[in-house]
Amino acid sequence: DDDLDAHINDTLVAGDGLCDSEAVRFTVTNGPAAIQWLIDNGVPFTPEHDPAARYPYHLTREGGHNARRIIHADDATGRAVVDTLVAKVAQHPNITQRNDLTVVGLLQDNQGACRGAYGSDTNQQWHSLTARHTVLATGGASGLYRHTTTPAPSSGEGMMMAAELGARLMNLEFQQFHPTCLFDPEGPAFLISEAVRGEGGHLLNEVGERFMLALDKRAELAPRDVVARAIDAEIQRSTLGHVWLDIRHLGEKAICHHFPTILAHCASRGIDITQQAIPVVPAAHYSCGGVATNLQGATNVANLYAIGETACTGLHGANRMASNSLLECLVFARSCAQTLLAQGQEQFGQAASSSEFQPPARAAAAVLPKEVLSDIRQQMRTTMSQHVSIVRSAAGLSAALAHLKALLNSLEEINGALTAPEGKRLHQTLQLAILTVLAAQQRHESRGLHYSTDWPHQQPTAVASSLSINDLSEALEKNR
């Protein structure tokens, strides 16, 4: 049995007191229509073969949900949705795709309104893209960390583009980490599903002992944040840099039946999971914070909107419940689109010409040292992973802030760095990392995904964090 109120309650519980109840109810209430829109557009969801079932599609259950309510496309729902919609976009006569451009900033008029975006092409030339409305859907900030669950993660550049125009950034300190990502520093990210532990997988430390048994009565089946903190603690006290996820005891037949994708992928990386334990680490997985928006995706900057992981709608609070993020993307994107269509074009007047707003001039013949930029990025990721990840402390956050400021100064001292696309994006990434540290420093408690050894308990009242580009400027001016 399930209903909307049950889904709402599960979401509020997962958000640990910080959810916006209006955003939660809005998302859940509008969810069925959004799902039906996907079905109407041809997303191949897995059918339910039980003739007595109440719904024609198979529903599964994930962490935090107290009922089977998640529609899916086998074990690759996200890809099925994206592939279907990308094909629709390619066929649409009124949509122009510019895959040759990398957007690095937004255009703003004298009244402070957003008037489009600018980016560079493969020849490093700037292009202005003017628009009556601009919608950011640039992903989260998992790329701030050394280990992520996505092969090509964004690092919050879109969030900083919005902040540069004056948008508020909310709840940046709440970064979700998945407990088990394949540990392979030289290879692409690969998520090891929680189903592996659900089917009986054991987490082992450096000496081959199960460490979850002594920490939680649910052992490997404890909540995601509990398991991630336990793994992080083991890594900190060992020399491996990872722990082991062992399913050899399940037997080859069961492994082949339940985990064919994981079996094949690990084999391609030289690991036979029927004979070897899998090296795993917690990895940055989802950003609960982002650009603050209302129920239509609007930011506090006129004509600028944000959708998905780029945004912070208040739905997730201090911790995202599994699969709510994809639902959020759909519901808020539809709400945003319907709002813009309802407004019509008359009230916005003539669209600005591309000559009215220009990107910043690029320094002549600026050639950035790629090795130096790469080193700065790697140092940033190491610092964030060491001090601003699963377990935090006041001393660690202070150390992170000092190091990130030094990295930012190093980048700014490179001739032409801030007028070249690659330098501009790295600058945005470092700025967002600093803002994330500031948000974490402001939270004198442990709540949801933010766990502090100095503040292990919750404050009686949950308050969302909110920062702007001015807060960043003030922080950078200190100790200069």
What does each of the following model-derived ranges do?
Residues 39-125, 130, 137, 146, ...:
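Conserved redox-cofactor binding core of oxidoreductases
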Residues 1-27:
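Glycine-rich active-site loop/strand segments that organize a redox cofactor
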Residues 161, 167-278, 339-345:
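An anion/pyrophosphate-binding glycine-rich loop and adjacent beta-alpha core
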Residues 19-29, 69-87, 98, 148-156, ...:
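Short beta-strand to alpha-helix junction loop
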Residues 131-133, 137-142, 310:
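Glycine-/small-residue-rich beta->alpha transition segments that form the dinucleotide
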Residues 260-305:
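FAD/FMN-dependent oxidoreductases across multiple families
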Residues 37, 43-67, 109, 204-220, ...:
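Glycine- and aromatic-enriched mobile tails/lids
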Residues 18-23, 35-55, 168-171, 241, ...:
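A short alpha-helix-loop-beta-strand transition element characteristic
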